[in-house]
Amino acid sequence: MRLHSLLFACGAALLLTACDESPKDTWHGYAEGNYVRVAPIGGGIVEKVAVKRGDLVKRGDLLFKLETTSEEADLESAEAGLTEAKTTLREAELEYQRKVKLRAQHNVAQAEVDTAHARRDRAGAAVLTAASAITQAKWRLARREGRAPADAIIQDVMFREGEFANPNQPVVSMLPPQNIKVRFFVPEAELGNIKEGGKVLLTCSGCPQNLSGTIRFLSTEVKFTPPVIYSDQSKEKLVYMAEATLDETPRTLHPGQPVTVSLLPRPAD
C-alpha cells in the first residue's frame, strides 16, 4: 500500500512539473499600450469635455475645449477690420478711377492721379493684412480645442470642466488600437530561435484564435525574468525582452493582459 501511494505521489509530481513547463518556442508576456496624451498648446480654463473613459473616437473628433472669450473677441475684431479695409479699398478704387477720367479731360494734374493710385495700393495691402489677421485669429481659436489625432479608445480624462489646464498638460489620454503591442521574454538559450520580422502566434483570454503578430524589436540587454512573469521554473533564467506588433488588434486585448507567445513556422519557399 505504501509503495502504491509513493508511486502515485511521484507520478503526480512529474505531471505537475511537466504541465508547468512551457513548450519549446513558447514564451510568456503581456500586452502593452503606447498612449497618446492630448494637451492644449496654451493654458486655460477647460470649458467643455466632450468624451469620457471608454469612448470610441474617430480622428478629428472634439475631445475638449478651453475657454475662448479672448480668442473670439480677437476674431471678431479682425473680421471688423477686414470689413473696414474692404470699404476703404472700394472708395480708393472709385477715387482713382475718377482721377483717371479727369486726367483724360486734362482737368487734374498727373500728380493727383499718382496720389490716388498710391492710396488704392495702400488700401489693397491693408485688405491683405486684415485677411491675414483673421487667419491668425482663427488659428489661435482652433488651438483652444483638443481633437483626436487618430481613431482610438479614451483611456482617461485628467480634467473636469472649470479646471485650469497648463500649456502642454495632457487633458485626455487615448489608445489607438495600432499602438497595442505584446512584450515577451525569451530565455538566453532560445534567443537564436527568433529574429526581428519573425511571425508569432498570440494566445490570450478572450482573444480570437490564430491571432498573429510580427516581432519588431529584440533587446540586446540580458536581464533576469521580470516579476510580472515570475515562476519557480523561470526565477533564475536570464531573458531578453522582445516586442511584437499585432497583425490585427482585437478589442478584447488590453494593456497588462497576459499573453502567451508561440513561434510560428516559417512558410515553405
Cite the ranges covered by each PLM segment:
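Short, solvent-exposed secondary-structure boundary/capping segments
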Residues: E221-D232
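Amphipathic alpha-helical coiled-coil/rod segments that serve as protein-protein coupling scaffolds
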Residues: K24, A50, L56-I153, M158-E161
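N-terminal beta-strand block that forms a small beta-sandwich/beta-barrel module immediately after a flexible targeting
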Residues: L15-A50
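Short, surface-exposed secondary-structure boundary micro-motifs
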Residues: L62, T68-T69, V113, P170, ...
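Surface-exposed connector loops and short turns at secondary-structure junctions
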Residues: L128, F184-S212, S234-V261
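Exposed loop and linker-edge segments at protein-protein interfaces
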Residues: A50, L56, T68, M158, ...
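Sec-dependent bacterial lipoprotein signal peptides
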Residues: M1-T17
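Surface-exposed patches in structured soluble domains
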Residues: Y30-A31, V46-A50, L56-R59, R140, ...
